Amino acid sequence: MSGKAALSNAYFADLQTALAKAGLCEPVLLIDKTRLNQNIDTLKKLLPRGMAYRIVAKSLPSEKLLIHVAKRARTDRLMSFNAAMVAQLLARLPHYDQLLGKPVPVAALATLLAGLKPSQKKALAQVQWLIDTPQRAQQYGELAKAQKLTLRLNLEIDVGLHRGGMAPGEGLQATLDEISKTPQLALSGLMGYEPHLTKLPKLAGWPRRAKSATREIYTAAVAQTTQTMGARAVKNMVRNMAGSPTFRLYQDTQLANEMAAGSTLVKPSDFDMPLLKPFVPAAFIATPAL
């Protein structure tokens, strides 16, 4: 099936025929591989030069699907969201780099570590744990000392969404100081989650001001991190910001050098927005008519 084909009656008739040939007679989620590939290629073409792509694993929750997207997009970066997901990906895709999209409580991390095989513990070097407070950084440091391992930490910067994370200032400084004095902790990057930029009402310049404020906050966080950790450390670290709804707002890698997306590759109706117009729907729910 052509990825550029319109969603016509003929298209859905072809899907129906394919499902019947496959012997699928119960409700299923169907991915049009041709359309998926078209979206992957579109994403890569739209990324600024030097912008790395990280696959959001929860949006494409299938090992085969993740591997396919990773190969076609030429990336080994995944975003996971809880300890159970980390464990599954460590077991099945141990060579992929994982970045947590949400902080994991230290108790959950301890439970995860207790259940890992020795080979999987080695793969922990591929995981970046999201840290949102100085207290969590301290807890991770204590656990790392007790377990005699090194944990990579990516710091969540509150750029205006106010879901958590640290603003530039005392909290961020305390976290950076904790990492600096703890050999078992390593700074791997900064994350600035900003999906609110495309959801604000277009009144009185709100989107423009929010975008400007986001850039100012994140720039200040990078500057503070550079002052504490050194320019070399910051140059090589992950600066993750954009997601499916917002990555087209970035024209270069001056601020962010990595974006994370998953849903835009299959484009459910929630992602039918102007910035994602170049992408086509690639996921469909099929159910027999009784």
Whereabouts are the PLM-identified features?
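Generic N-terminal amphipathic, Lys/Arg-enriched alpha-helix
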Residues: 11-29
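Active-site-proximal beta-alpha core segment in soluble small-molecule metabolic enzymes
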Residues: 53-199
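Active-site loop/helix belt of alpha/beta enzymes
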Residues: 152, 158-277
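Aromatic/hydrophobic pocket-lining residues that form the small-molecule binding cavity
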Residues: 36, 40, 109, 133, ...
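N-terminal glycine-rich anion-binding loops that anchor highly charged ligand groups
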Residues: 12-16, 35-64
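N-terminal basic/disordered segments at the start of proteins
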Residues: 1-12
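Short coil-to-beta-strand transition motifs
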Residues: 249, 279-286
